[in-house]
Amino acid sequence: KIHIVYSPADANAKTQFALTLGQIVGETQHVLYLNMEECSGLTGLLGEHHWNMADLIYFLRQNKSQFLYRLNSMVQKFGAMDYIPPCDSYTDFCQITVKEWKKLLHLIRSQSTYDVIILDMGTSTGHELELLRQCDGIYMPVKKDPISRGKIEQWDRYIQILDGLDILELLQKLELPPDGTGSGSESDLSMLPEQRLGSYIRELLTS
């Protein structure tokens, strides 16, 4: 299954939710987290690695036959989930086409052993509608302040204009509890499943 975490109004809460969701689901299933943001901010928190998402896409362009080997060689661990280090170059990220994103998801689904893919999706891919249609469910963290509400309402209108009612049917808008991530270090992020956000997600998954 593919679950997308997306929000046009609250990028920080979106990523905290996605990381926590991945770790919790990873306790019982084989989970891969993919960050699809042009500026994830995770490199400093999760550490720098020799390979990242841009390299995986580049390899996909060159040699699809050994894709699974390359994917497995790039996977890193964070708590109970696996992840591919996100792009650290805005230019590299912007050169990835929707066709390549869709091919990547198809190959992971068809060739890997992952039960669940968590997509932490930004608002600058330029292909949100097409990618949202690849998933089995969409989680959207929302805030109550007027600006956030305005952004969500504008996004809803945009989706309806583009005949995206099928996307809205997959959507769950979530008002998250206040976070307790402390200083924002890797150890703080790894503790999210045991904090209020983790309890909220566990209840959400069983409801």
Residue ranges, per PLM feature:
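Phosphate-binding loop that captures ATP/GTP phosphates
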Residues: T28-Y83
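Conserved catalytic-core segment of NTP-binding enzymes
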Residues: K103-M191
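Structural motif
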Residues: Y6-D10, N35-E38, P86-D88, D120-T123, ...
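Conserved beta-strand scaffold positions in the cores of enzyme catalytic domains, especially
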Residues: I2, V31-Y33, M81-Y83, I138, ...
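Cytosolic-facing regulatory segments adjacent to core modules
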Residues: Q66-K77, P85-M121
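Walker A/P-loop phosphate-binding motif and the immediately C-terminal alpha-helix
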Residues: I2-E38, L42-L46
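NTP-binding/hydrolysis catalytic cores, primarily Walker-type P-loop NTPases
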Residues: E186-S207
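Short acidic, S/G/P-rich loop/turn micro-motifs used as interaction or catalytic elements
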Residues: D10-A13, D88-T97, S124-H127, K144-R149
